[in-house]
Amino acid sequence: MKVTVIGGGPGGLYFSILLKKAVPDCSVSVYERNKADDSFGFGVVFSDETLSEFLTRDPQSYDLIRTKFAYWDELDVARDGEKVRITGNGFCGCSRKTLLQLLQQRCREEGVDLHFEANVDDLSQFSDSDIIVAADGINSGIREKHTEEFGTEIEMKSNRFVWLGSTRPLDSFTYFFRTTPYGTFVAHTYQYEEGMSTWIFETTDETWQKAGFSVTDEEDTIKKISEIFKEELDGHGLISNRSHWRQFPVITNKKWNTDNIVLLGDAKATAHYSIGSGTKLAMECAIALADSVIKYKTDTQAVFTNYEKLRRNRVEMIQHAANVSLQWFEDMDRHIQHDFMKFAFSVMTRSKKVTFENLALRDPLFTQKVLAEFNTKEGNTNTTTSAAFTPFTLRGMTVDNRIVMSPMEQYNAKDGLVTDWHLMHYGARA
């Protein structure tokens, strides 16, 4: 069996390791357009759950990587000098460059052929390959040549973001929000190795335009951002690495394969960085694809069917959560107006995957602060009462709680106007 992987990112490399390890007589080759030590971006994030999966799949790479991780259990939400810490968020960060180098090392140990500075434009040279894995990233050339077959859809979102680094040490994942005369900016930040942290700055397109940023002027970007986040950077500078302002593309594909080509990683599906699942998604899909190839070998249709069966629902669930989170940040000028604890709670629950009950288990002190702020503002003497069960006043009417049941379908009004059915129904009860 011969398998060719186009793209030497975490997903492509991890797939190659797992397949070659399980099927040593399989020929596995990886072609990467960049140099072996090139890496764009700074750090990557994994959850405790994902790390556990890596341990069971390839202990060797897990042992190599885990010594390089920066771990944290806390998440901070900061807004214009106010800050609250929420515990119970098990994550770790790692340098993307270090991760790639360690995965490359494991590939060589297992006998995977690695080819760097190999820009693949024509797949005909791999006509003898049983499977071609298109792991060539968010701007996948292979996907672009087969958009109709894959059913590719790309939606460019409106917010602007730029990926930078800093020497500023951080002991938690932190969201720094800053209000400016132009609008709201947020920095998604975390430490990924000793003395280095990732800083992803995001704002709405309108705010970005008002502030006078340029897409590719890195020097100007650093100057302006450093001034906005002067207090948060605490004397530390920002570091660029081809750090251009971008807009996030939400990529979906109706099919993940065509002929003997199969999509992996960002070429297949993107998840907004605000939920930290991009690299996780790629590597978990690499596991499923490797399992499918190991099970069905050269029966490519069975391989691809099983791959989608294992991952389609999970990928779409993560994408949905990421898109909901993305939408929250597109509306952050509205959210920023809330009282601080309510705002922090909104940040934590923005993807709808985390609920009040989840947070109460992770950090009961935080949810107590949220309720206390809410009840104090509402004039309730019991500061532990759930918001849903507090009275609510609408003009001259006060109801006992805030729970609303949706009406039955027959109560629907046409264009917001009552019909003869409503007149008869309510008239009979007058």
Briefly describe each language-model feature range.
Residues Q368-A430:
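Flavin-dependent oxidoreductase catalytic cores
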Residues T4-K21, V133-A134, L164, H244-V324, ...:
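Conserved mid-domain beta->alpha element of the FAD-binding
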Residues D48-G165, P364-K377:
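Conserved N-terminal helical subregion
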Residues K35-E53:
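Conserved N-terminal glycine-rich FAD pyrophosphate-binding loop of Rossmann-like flavoproteins
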Residues G11, F15, A36, N139:
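Conserved Rossmann-like nucleotide-cofactor binding loop
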Residues E82-N89, S95, E110, D171-V250:
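Conserved FAD/dinucleotide-binding core of flavoprotein oxidoreductases
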Residues I6, T67, D291-T381:
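C-terminal helical "tail/cap" subdomain of flavin- and related membrane-associated enzymes
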Residues K20-F40:
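Glycine-rich FAD pyrophosphate-binding loop
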